[in-house]
């Protein structure tokens, strides 16, 4: 499913397996995972709230990030690209991937970065396609 800000894919995989699958799919398009926020553990620790298994992965394609930051350093406010993985149940997980193209459009220099926006969109769409094929 194509969302306004990204893509959404449901996987028939456990939460932990889905995280590994998403990480591998991101690598196929040059994205690495820079950060991993365990939302469930953080909410439990900070406010003693129970929450379903949910992680936010900070994904970065160094080449795209370099080009974007060189054009508009303020784009760093939107980096890295967030990818969320959440458990639907024990056998299914929901993945949402930020569309780098949509992020670039928030920049005051969006017109200068349209080619980059298109490339970022294509790469993340390819990641979503890899996941949908599973």
What is the role of each PLM region?
Residues 2-3, 27, 49-52, 88:
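Short glycine-enriched loop/turn motifs at secondary-structure junctions
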Residues 32, 38-84:
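Compact, glycine-rich, soluble single-domain proteins
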Residues 8-10, 21-23, 34, 41, ...:
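Amphipathic alpha-helical hairpins
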Residues 84-110:
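Beta-strand/loop substructures that line and gate deep hydrophobic ligand-binding cavities in soluble
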Residues 1-29:
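Terminal, regulation- and interaction-focused segments at domain boundaries
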